[in-house]
Amino acid sequence: LRQTFGKRVSPCHTSMKINKHCFPNGLRLVHYEDTSTQMVALNIVYDVGARDEHPEHTGFAHLFEHLMFGGSAHIPDYDTPLQLAGGENNAWTNNDITNYYLTVPKTNVETAFWLESDRMLELTFSEQGLEVQRGVVMEEFKQRCLNQPYGDIGHLFRPLAFRVHPYRWPTIGKELSHIEQATLDEVKSFFYRFYAPNNAVLAVTGNISWEETVRLTEKWFGPVPRRNVPVRRLPQEPEQTEERRLTVERNVPLDALLMGYHMCDRGNADYYTFDILSDILSNGRSSRCLLYTSPSPR
């Protein structure tokens, strides 16, 4: 692979002009102007994920992703104003971050700043809202992890790879009961600890100037106060010194083999080499592992 792609991955050189600014409340802004489109995209990344959960209260980061669409301080329904503005949105959570993004026509871009800043300021917390979203997430847990073949692979594999680090449980949570037992007070505490301008990065790209982006960010996000975000103290995962193996027998259509190796972090220059290598070996019908194990040539 190194002979094919070079001894080391070189950084990508681009003529894209990226603007950056940090506001007094700690919000970091990243901007790129693209006049070839009539749309503008806003993306907010909060520095919180499943790794920040208590081992006995897992699944909270993902649950909270759902709660963020349940209404905020001055906007009882998030989706309706966005749809009226011609926009669309989505979100996802992983072990490290929670990501929210939306796109709107450039003529309605201020609606996007208004919506995102208001739910960063404060959500509408209610027992009814929690019950609804808790039910949605529990059904997702059942559908993905309990009711289909191989659905619990993440729950089986992660504890093999990580013994003490919170990467040892999947984003959706270790157990269904953790989500079922989530209380409103716990949800509020999670919000005020992690959902803060000084724990977020706002990226804006599309047909909007840097000056207008700064103005709208200052107008809508500037009044959102800083919060006391806890210092992250994660346990250090000890080095793996021997092979770890687990065999599970199930009534499933086909056998499955899952293998994993510890590798460098994303900031390492070799990360992209390993990422490409993983795709070549095992991603898709043309991957090497599939071709070499197939009973007939393809």
How does the language model describe each region?
Residues 33-35, 93, 250:
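Short, low-complexity Ser/Thr-rich regulatory SLiMs
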Residues 41-103, 169-172, 283-294:
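M16/MPP (pitrilysin/insulinase) zinc-metallopeptidase core fold and M16-derived inactive scaffolds
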Residues 243-249:
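Short, low-order "capping/linker" segments at domain edges
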